[in-house]
């Protein structure tokens, strides 16, 4: 997609992508007015302090005192710091514009620094601004209203004390920059506080002059606490150095500031720049170069190797690189160029101190004495060899006029410090001898001939004739057309090829001006398309070559001449095919004839000369026609789209304004929605088409309501049977943009507004910083790489976000609109997925694998934004999903260790790699340990507790619980209730106490670890041992007993040690003692003196078993 630079109501150049709209005068007037009135707002905060009257002299004293305190002493001592301050102005204003464009919001604090810098710059430049008002307007340095206010000041009686005001503005700027965020936040209560009326009147009305300085002084005073007031206690600094100050400022502005300003703005085209580095629509057309025109030339200036590493060049880079008027046509075009560490041999023929064009280089644009043009650079230089010795040196009259241009900033514009004499560089002579080398230097440039020059120390270095790549598409006229106020309001596109900026071209052509006016006034797409061809042609007809060249012809015979026609590189020349004898059919000839007019138009737009086109076959000729038509159609489409927001859609955009919400300026689109609905009442098709094109080609990323409005229009059109008709008016490309599901490498907007075949769509952002907007269906959104934004409004359905992006530095966001706040949503976790669900069940967003690596993995969403300005980062989301509710929750620990409390409900708790504390609390809970040494507590209810790899402690609590230790040396406590305990592998300990109920232990393991059963609160004599089949039952009472399942199956099922309060039983031969009395204890359920079952020998048998096994428990 194409980037475009637009100037918005004098606010400055703002880069919008793609084909982005101006925001409209209403919106930006409101915004700029708000900026201007911010000082008024701050003034009102401490209004009570303004009761103290301050005189003008006190104000002067304050300003001078402050300037002295920061080391300026009434003069500019550090130009670099001022230039750095200027950098901040541009950077901060661009950042504010970016925030507004991408989010529709900005914090007032974000513009505080920019405002302060503006006031400082205004103060520093007051003397020179008076003389440069119009120049500053062209540079778009300050907002329109601020410039207007300053101009009114300078044209009023205030001019008599301009230096005083200059001091005040400086001081004001510094104080605004230092102003505290807290106080500023307290003052922002209502957008009505930001009316521009006071300051507008403050500066504009000359009759208020007598009060102005006092008012400004009072304002400054209100910003400063009493204990920091710099002007209390004397008048030592009054009026110091005012004249010197003004003189130094003017000198600084002329010598340092203004050139810097112009250079800065050269990096950002001042006009509606609709060309990327190399537009797609021109690619195939320019590939016809080897088949175009019987005349060609290359740019071949002489260059000198100044640093000893050979002659180096750079590629033609469109507007980002050097632009130079090689042909002396008054048009600077993009060109290959010599690198900054080497130089071009030049001669200032007109003595204006500037290298104006190719005639002042040494090459094929150098005019010789006989009126012809030089064949190459060496031939051009040879004319200066007045003594015929084949060397150019001091013996030749013109030697002293030669200069070497070392283009340090690579802009193609010579500055005084870039032009150096041969003497300065230690060059003694230039040798006219050379060899043809035709060396490819890369970047489209060639070293055609190479010789040498001699230095004053006797050494030699390389000198050569370059063939530089040419790009005539990217061009800038060297002169400017003065526009009237009315002409300056016309729609505009940047000049291209041999065409001036559209607005300037219209000022010079009545036909174009009338056509542009008619086109701008057309109210429907159909009406504009009916005029588009005529508009394109009228602009092309302003080409200075229009009508001067011979009609285009076809040929199979290529003839090479020099110096005229299309600029080709040597590689392009080599591609030409000569002397092919082919005749064309009548059909092909007719197609060529039909394309002639379009070929002439494309020549004007691309700076080419296609007076002759060459072909090798009929297929070749027809392909020329196809490329011509395709290129023209793409050109027309680009012009239409880039004029769209300056013409037909401009009235809608004028309805956008600003509102204040939660201390944040926000774009207010309510008027825009009303405007579309108003049009729809009388012309539904126009409203449908206009809204669709605004969404397809605009940059209103934050206007989510517009997507829903479009979806409503689509549904209504379908019901009315008009949808197919509306789509035909829109065209396939617009429909495809609104229905597309896959992005590109650019910053795409993917949206479900009903143009697709399915209500449920899948959106893929791929590369770039994309915006993916789900509709009412169940959508799948995958952002890909880049900083992506996923947008969800009310009724967003059951959507899935897949956000895998491992790149560093990216920032992915989920944005909830339509007034959705965090309180309206629940945040839960399921496995590694984040589930964001509307409490009214109107939708759910599942962010897949969000919690991989505890939310630091490649799937994370960095921030979740809400309309009220609240932002949730990853850390906050991690806390939210660990909060329990009264329902059944799923809570997960993190790798660093967590404490989870399930609360009420039947909960699921999951440990991780850390040492976790997992409390189920009330309810029938399921608790799963992780890899750490975890503590699991079931609490009330019938719980299931599962250990894992670590040495875990499992406590079932009240209820009939299931405990499984798995791996590790675990401790299992069943607690009250009839519990099931399974230790798993490792040396496990089972704890049994009074009131624990009737528990079952399953202790099977294949390892040889030692397991323990600990009876707390019991002595050895209190517990009776019973064999029940293959199980061992240990009973302390009828209510409290433990059954060890399969104890007598073998060693793998046994508990090795029984620990009591007074002793421990531990013997690997324990089973044989039990077996000796097997017939005595079998089938007994209660210990005691039950002689009917035991023959009166039970206690004796138990004693005989226990006696050898008694050991004293360790202390």
Swiss-Prot record:
It is a peripheral membrane protein. It comes from the Bacteria. Keywords: Calcium, Cell outer membrane, Membrane, Repeat, Secreted, Toxin, Virulence. InterPro entries: Haemolys_ca-bd (IPR010566), Hemolysin-typ_Ca-bd_CS (IPR018511), Hemolysn_Ca-bd (IPR001343), RTX_toxin/Mannuronan_C5-epim (IPR050557), RTX_toxin_determinant-A (IPR003995), Serralysin-like_metalloprot_C (IPR011049). GO terms for molecular function: calcium ion binding; toxin activity. The keyword Nuclease does not apply. One of its GO terms (cellular component) is cell outer membrane. Hemolysin-type calcium-binding repeats lie at residues 755-772, 773-790, 901-918, 919-936, 937-954, 955-972, 973-990. It is found in: Cell outer membrane; Secreted. The Gly-rich region is probably involved in binding calcium, which is required for target cell-binding or cytolytic activity. Belongs to the RTX prokaryotic toxin (TC 1.C.11) family. May participate in the pathogenesis of meningococcal disease. PANTHER family: S-LAYER PROTEIN. This is Iron-regulated protein FrpA. It comes from Neisseria meningitidis serogroup C.
């Amino acid at each position: 997609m194409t980037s475009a630079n637009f100037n918005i109501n004098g606010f400055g150049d703002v880069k919008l992508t793609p084909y982005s709209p101006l925001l409209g005068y209403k919106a930006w007037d409101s915004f700029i007015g708000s900026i201007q009135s911010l000082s008024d707002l701050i003034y009102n905060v401490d209004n009570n302090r303004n009761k103290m009257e301050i005189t003008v002299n006190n104000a002067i004293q304050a300003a001078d005192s402050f300037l002295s305190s920061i080391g300026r002493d009434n003069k500019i001592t550090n130009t670099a710091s001022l230039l750095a301050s200027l950098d901040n102005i541009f950077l901060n204003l661009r950042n504010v514009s970016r925030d507004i464009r991408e989010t529709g919001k900005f914090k007032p604090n974000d513009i505080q620094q920019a405002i302060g810098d503006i006031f400082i710059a205004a103060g520093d430049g007051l003397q020179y601004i008076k003389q440069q008002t119009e120049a500053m307007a062209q540079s778009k340095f300050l907002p329109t209203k601020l410039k207007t206010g300053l101009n009114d000041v300078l044209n009023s009686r205030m001019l008599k004390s301009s230096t005083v005001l200059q001091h005040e503005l400086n001081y004001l700027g510094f104080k605004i920059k230092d102003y505290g965020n807290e106080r500023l936040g307290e003052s922002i209560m209502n957008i009505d506080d930001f009316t521009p009326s006071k300051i507008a009147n403050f500066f504009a009305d000359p009759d208020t002059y007598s009060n102005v300085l006092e008012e400004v002084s009072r304002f400054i005073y209100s910003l400063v606490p009493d204990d920091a007031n710099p002007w209390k206690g004397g008048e030592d600094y009054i009026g110091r150095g005012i004249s010197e100050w003004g003189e130094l400022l003017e000198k600084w502005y002329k010598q340092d500031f203004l050139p810097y300003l112009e250079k800065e703005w050269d990096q950002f085209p001042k006009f509606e720049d609709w060309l990327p580095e190399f537009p797609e629509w021109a690619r195939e057309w320019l590939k016809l170069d080897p088949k175009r025109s019987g005349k060609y030339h290359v740019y071949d200036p002489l260059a000198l190797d100044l640093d000893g590493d050979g002659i180096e060049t750079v590629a033609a880079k469109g507007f980002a690189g050097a632009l130079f008027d090689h042909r002396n046509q008054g048009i600077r075009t993009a060109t290959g160029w010599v690198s900054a560490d080497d130089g071009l041999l030049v001669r200032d023929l007109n003595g204006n101190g500037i290298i104006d064009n190719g005639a002042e280089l040494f090459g094929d644009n150098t005019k010789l004495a006989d009126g012809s043009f030089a064949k190459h650079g060496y031939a051009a230089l040879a004319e200066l060899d007045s003594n015929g010795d084949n060397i150019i040196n001091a013996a030749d009259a013109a030697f002293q006029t030669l200069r070497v241009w070392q283009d340090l900033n690579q802009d193609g514009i010579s500055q005084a410090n870039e032009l150096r004499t041969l003497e300065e560089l230690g060059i003694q002579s230039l040798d006219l001898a050379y060899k043809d080398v035709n060396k490819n230097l890369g970047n489209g440039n060639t070293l055609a001939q190479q010789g040498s020059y001699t230095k004053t120390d006797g050494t030699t270095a390389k000198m050569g004739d370059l063939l530089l790549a040419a790009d005539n598409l990217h061009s800038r006229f060297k002169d400017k057309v003065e526009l009237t106020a009315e002409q300056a309001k016309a729609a505009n596109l940047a000049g291209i090829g041999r065409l001036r900026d559209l607005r300037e071209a219209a000022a010079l052509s009545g036909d174009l001006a009338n056509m542009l006016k008619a086109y701008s006034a057309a109210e429907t797409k159909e009406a504009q398309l009916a005029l588009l061809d005529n508009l394109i042609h009228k602009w092309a007809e302003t080409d200075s070559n229009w009508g001067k060249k011979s009609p285009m012809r076809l040929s199979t015979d290529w003839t090479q001449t020099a110096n005229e026609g299309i600029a080709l590189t040597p590689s392009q020349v080599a591609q030409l095919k000569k002397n092919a004898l082919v005749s064309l059919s009548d059909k092909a000839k007719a197609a060529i004839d039909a394309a002639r007019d379009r070929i002439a138009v494309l020549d004007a737009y691309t700076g080419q000369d296609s007076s002759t086109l060459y072909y090798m076959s009929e297929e070749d000729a027809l392909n020329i026609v196809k490329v011509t038509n395709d290129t023209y159609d793409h050109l027309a489409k680009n012009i239409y789209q880039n004029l769209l927001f300056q013409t037909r859609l401009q009235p809608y955009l004028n309805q956008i304004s600003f509102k204040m919400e939660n201390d944040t300026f926000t774009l207010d689109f309510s008027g825009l929605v009303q405007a579309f609905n108003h049009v729809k009442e009388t012309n539904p098709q126009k409203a449908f088409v206009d809204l669709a094109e605004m969404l397809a080609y605009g940059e209103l990323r934050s206007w989510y309501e517009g997507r829903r409005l479009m979806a409503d229009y689509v549904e209504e059109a379908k019901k009315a049977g008009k949808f197919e008709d509306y789509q035909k008016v829109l065209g396939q490309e617009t429909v495809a943009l609104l229905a597309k599901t896959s992005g590109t490498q650019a910053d795409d907007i993917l949206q479900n507004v009903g143009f697709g075949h399915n209500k449920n769509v899948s959106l893929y952002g791929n590369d770039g910083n994309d915006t993916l907007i789900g509709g009412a269906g169940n959508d799948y959104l995958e952002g890909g790489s880049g900083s992506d934004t996923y947008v969800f409004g009310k009724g967003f359905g059951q959507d899935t976000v897949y956000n895998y992006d491992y790149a560093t530095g990216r920032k992915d966001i989920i944005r909830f609109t339509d007034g959705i706040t965090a309180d309206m949503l629940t945040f839960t976790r399921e496995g590694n997925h984040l589930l964001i669900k509307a409490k009214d069940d109107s939708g759910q967003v599942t962010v897949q694998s969000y919690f991989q690596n505890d939310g630091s993995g490649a799937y994370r969403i960095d921030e979740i934004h809400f309309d009220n300005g609240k932002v949730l980062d990853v850390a906050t989301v991690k806390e939210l999903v660990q909060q329990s509710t009264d329902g059944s929750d799923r809570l997960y620990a993190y790798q660093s260790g967590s404490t989870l409390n399930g609360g009420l409900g039947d909960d699921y708790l999951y440990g991780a790699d850390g040492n976790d504390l997992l409390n189920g609390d009330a309810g029938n809970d399921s608790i799963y340990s992780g890899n750490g040494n975890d503590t699991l507590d079931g609490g009330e209810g019938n719980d299931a507790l599962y250990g894992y790899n670590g040495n875990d402690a499992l406590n079932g609590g009240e209820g009939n619980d299931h405990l499984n230790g798995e791996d590790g040396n675990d401790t299992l406590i069943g607690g009250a209730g009839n519990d099931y305990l399974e230790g798993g592998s490792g040396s496990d300990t089972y704890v049994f106490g009074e009131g624990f109920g009737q528990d079952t232990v399953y202790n099977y393991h294949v390892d040889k670890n030692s397991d323990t059963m600990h009876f707390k609160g019991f002595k050895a004599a209190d517990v009776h041992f019973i064999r029940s089949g293959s199980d061992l039952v240990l009973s302390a009472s009828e209510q409290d007993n433990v059954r060890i399942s399969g104890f007598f199956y073998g060693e793998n099922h046994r508990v090795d040690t029984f620990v009591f309060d007074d002793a421990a039983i531990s013997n690997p031969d324990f089973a044989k003692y039990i077996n000796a009395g097997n017939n005595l204890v079998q089938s007994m359920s209660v210990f005691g003196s039950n002689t009917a079952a035991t023959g009166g020998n039970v206690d004796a048998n138990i004693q005989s078993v226990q006696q050898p096994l008694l050991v004293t428990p360790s202390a």
